Each structure stands twice: as structure tokens, then as C-alpha cells.
UniProtKB/Swiss-Prot annotation:
Molecular-function GO terms, alphabetical: glutamate dehydrogenase (NADP+) activity
Keyword field: NADP, Oxidoreductase
Subunit-level organization: Homohexamer.
The keyword Acetylation appears for this protein: no
Protein name (Swiss-Prot/TrEMBL): NADP-specific glutamate dehydrogenase
NCBIfam families (UniProt xref): PRK09414.1 (NF006929)
Domain of life per record: Eukaryota
Residues that span the membrane, as ranges: none
Annotated catalysed reactions: L-glutamate + NADP(+) + H2O = 2-oxoglutarate + NH4(+) + NADPH + H(+)
């Protein structure tokens, strides 16, 4: 009987990686990598601390703060901070574990980590959020630094919270350094950072489409279902529209907003209204009944979009949270004509859904759904965070065109690396598309494993 705590989210992430390595020829060709897997699955350091702060009534409030410093073989620990009541050590270990390999796939010098708190920003005043961030950073600042650990935003941590956190770090440490990414543009932030994850997942899928069609097709004319309505979903939607596609759904934790007419699409103006709503920390349901939305969209409470979209659609981009596509929903996506699914969120698909997608890919040469895991498809966000770190180190700021061009190059490399690695270690049958989940897992893992071996972390 194990004396380790039950950590379902982390165990799911570990088993997903381990099973893809086992089902490839990697361990046959390199049996020593089994030892590396054992070592890399244990965090280098886990920091847990209390956060005591004062609400607007002058009452003491207590939350738990965490930072999982998982692996630093490739560079400083790098990964977001999440403020949400669901946060626990299992979720942060899963996110940090995924982050190791995602960061490796970018080709930049970044290790993997993740942190956060079970604090819920919803319903809190600006003053309460500022006081919480100040208390949180008062403890976290002892464990981070530009060359040690560089956190960023995540769910519940927007540019505003990053500003509060950065200000407290600067006051306590008396240092201005690139200790956080996602900063404001006038104080060390990078252009394209808010857009990066959403843009990146669309750039990645564009390469998938071009590979399958021999360069004959793109997003133009394709219907795209997106879940979520935060940064990732908003900017993915805007990029899809820019490239000629139609966005047919967005969602939040309370329900989904879906176009009524098969020929309709969200417009940039409607997405801007949704962005304003999210800044005000309100729900999509408040827009659904407004005159601008009621005639064009259906709002379905307590439902995800995947089984509620009218007609056929070609692309699905889960961009809300983990495990948001079930096995049953995966079957429905296939029946709805989806050819490409890429995770804008981390571990957006359950293992049951991934198994269904991969089985369909193997069984249907030339006409299969093709699944891209989050560690590759949504690496654009952390890639531009890495570019922000580079700009901070050089005390330079690049133009949005420079950053976007680098982002496109990184996403192309992520796609090609996963594709070529899959062809090498999990050679598909004739006409079958390579497994991007296998290729991405192996490519990220082997890069980290080799760096750890060179540095004496395993032998």
C-alpha cells in the first residue's frame, strides 16, 4: 500500500505520458530512459505556505499558497500562478509536470513549475485582491527570482494581479527584474503576450490542416467550436476569424453560447463585448439575453458546447479548463465531422476522449480526427513568456511583428518536432496520420531527460 497521497490529476498526467512512452519504441531503443522517467516525475521542490489577508470588513482571511518547482534542467522554473477555489497540490503537480515538457518543446531555456492558491477572486473587491496578492507575494518572494523561478498568470491571475504581485516583489527585494511574465507593456511586458496562447493554438492547427491537405486548405471556410471565454478562447476566436474561419461557440463555467444559424459566426465586435464582460468578472448568461445577442445566439446553461452545435463543424478547440471533453463528447465530435482537435487548455480532454481520438486516427486512414495535446498546441503562451524573459534580460522591447514572427516559428517547430518524433518512434501504418500526442510527449521528454543526465540528475 502506497504512503503517498491520492493525486488523481497528477496521476492522470503521469500515466498519459508513461503510456505513450511505453507504447512507442523509445524504451526498446533507450531502456535507460525508464530511470529518467522515475526521476523526472518527482518535483525538485514543493513549497506550501499560508496566506493571511484582510477583507473589506477588517476580518482575517486564510488561504493556502503553493509553488511546485518541478524541474530546472533546461532553465529557471517557469509556469503560471492559478487563483481558484479548486486549486490543490494534485492539480498544481499535474500542471507543473505538463509544463516541463511543454517548455522543452518551445526550444527556449525554461524549466517547469506551477503555483497558486485556493483563493477565489470572484466577488472580491479590487482592494481585497490587492491585499491578497501582497500577502501571497510576501511569502513567495523568498523562493523566486529571474534566474531561479519566473511565475506568470493563469486562471484567476490577469495582468492586474501580476502587477500587484510584481509591485510587492519589487518593494520587498528592492530589485526590478524579470521575476514575473505577463507584465504591463510600460514596465517590462512583451507585446503579443495576452494573445499568445490563443494565437499559438490556431497557428499550430493551421500546420495540421496544411499537412493533411498538402497545403491546399487553411482555416478559410471552416466552422470552429471553441470552449471558454477567457484570454485563450477570445484570441483564438479572433485569429480564426482573421484567417477566414467561423467561430460557432464560446462558453464559461455556467453555460455555453452557441450560434443558432449554421452560416453565422461570432464577430470581433461580439468577442470584444465578451472580453469587457470577463474583465468585469460577469457571466456569459448576462449577455445572452441582451438585444445584441438574443436573436443570434442560444445560451445553454450548465452545458459544454460540444454536443449542442447545429450542423457539421471541422475544428474543436477546448480552451476552458482540464477534462472538458469526455469520451461521450469525443464520439459526438467525430460524428459532427470534426477533423482537427487541439487543446487550448491544459489536459482539456479526458483520457477516455484521447483514447477515442487516437483509435479513430489509427482506424481511418485519410479520414480521421487528428488530436493535438495541450503541451504542444498551447505552448504559445509560455513561448512568448520566454521571449519576455529574453527582452527583460537584454533591457529591450521588440515590436509586435517581431514577437508574432518568433511565435509563428516556435509553433511551427513544435508541430514539426512532434510530427517527426512520432514518425521515428511510433511509425504509423501507411496512410495513417502520426500521433501528435506520442510525438510531442517523446520529443519533450527526451530533451529534458538528456539535459538531466548531462547534469548528473540520473545515470
Amino acid at each position: 500500500m502506497s504512503n503517498l497521497p491520492v493525486e488523481p490529476e497528477f496521476e492522470q498526467a503521469y500515466k498519459e505520458l508513461a503510456s505513450t512512452l511505453e507504447n512507442s519504441t523509445l524504451f526498446e531503443q533507450h531502456p535507460e530512459y525508464r530511470r529518467a522517467l522515475q526521476v523526472v516525475s518527482v518535483p525538485e521542490r514543493v513549497i506550501q505556505f499560508r496566506v493571511v489577508w484582510e477583507n473589506d470588513k477588517g476580518e482575517v482571511q486564510i488561504n493556502r499558497g503553493y509553488r511546485v518547482q518541478f524541474n530546472s534542467a533546461l532553465g529557471p522554473y517557469k509556469g503560471g500562478l492559478r487563483f481558484h477555489p479548486s486549486v490543490n497540490l494534485s492539480i498544481l503537480k499535474f500542471l507543473g509536470f505538463e509544463q516541463i515538457f511543454k517548455n522543452a518543446l518551445t526550444g527556449l531555456n525554461m524549466g517547469g513549475g506551477k503555483g497558486g492558491s485556493d483563493f477565489d477572486p470572484k466577488g472580491k473587491s479590487d482592494s481585497e485582491i490587492r491585499r491578497f496578492c501582497t500577502a501571497f507575494m510576501t511569502e513567495l518572494c523568498k523562493h523566486i527570482g529571474a534566474d531561479t523561478d519566473v511565475p506568470a498568470g493563469d486562471i484567476g491571475v490577469t495582468g492586474r494581479e501580476v502587477g500587484f504581485l510584481f509591485g510587492q516583489y519589487r518593494r520587498i527585494r528592492n530589485q526590478w527584474e524579470g521575476v514575473l511574465t505577463g507584465k504591463g507593456g510600460s514596465w517590462g511586458g512583451s507585446l503579443i503576450r495576452p494573445e499568445a496562447t490563443g494565437y499559438g493554438v490556431v497557428y499550430y492547427v493551421e500546420h495540421m490542416i496544411k499537412h493533411v491537405t498538402g497545403g491546399k486548405e487553411s482555416f478559410a471556410g471552416k466552422r470552429v467550436a471553441i470552449s471558454g471565454s477567457g484570454n485563450v478562447a477570445q484570441y483564438a476566436a479572433l485569429k480564426v476569424i482573421e484567417l477566414g474561419g467561423s467561430v460557432v461557440s464560446l462558453s464559461d463555467s455556467k453555460g455555453s453560447l452557441i450560434v443558432k444559424d449554421e452560416s453565422a459566426s461570432f464577430t470581433p465586435e461580439e468577442i470584444a463585448l465578451i472580453a469587457d464582460l470577463k474583465v468585469a468578472r460577469k457571466q456569459l448568461s448576462e449577455l445572452a439575453t441582451s438585444s445584441a445577442f438574443a436573436g443570434k445566439f442560444t445560451y445553454i446553461p450548465d452545458a459544454r458546447p460540444w454536443t449542442n452545435i447545429p450542423g457539421k463543424f471541422e475544428v474543436a478547440l477546448p480552451s476552458a479548463t482540464q477534462n472538458e471533453v469526455s469520451g461521450e463528447e469525443a464520439e459526438h465530435l467525430i460524428k459532427s465531422g470534426v477533423r482537427y482537435i487541439a487543446e487550448g487548455s491544459n489536459m482539456g480532454c479526458t483520457q477516455a476522449a484521447i483514447d477515442i481520438f487516437e483509435a479513430h486516427r489509427n482506424a481511418n486512414p485519410g479520414d480521421a480526427i487528428w488530436y493535438a495535446p495541450g503541451k504542444a498546441a498551447n505552448a504559445g503562451g509560455v513561448a512568448v513568456s520566454g521571449l519576455e524573459m529574453a527582452q527583460n534580460s537584454a533591457r529591450l522591447s521588440w515590436t509586435s511583428e517581431e514577437v508574432d514572427a518568433r511565435l509563428k516559428g516556435i509553433m511551427e517547430d513544435c508541430f514539426k518536432n512532434g510530427l517527426e518524433t512520432a514518425q521515428k518512434f511510433a511509425t504509423p501504418a501507411k496512410g495513417v496520420l502520426p500521433s501528435l500526442v506520442t510525438g510531442s510527449n517523446i520529443a519533450g521528454f527526451t530533451k529534458v531527460a538528456e539535459a538531466m543526465k548531462d547534469q548528473g540528475d540520473w545515470w
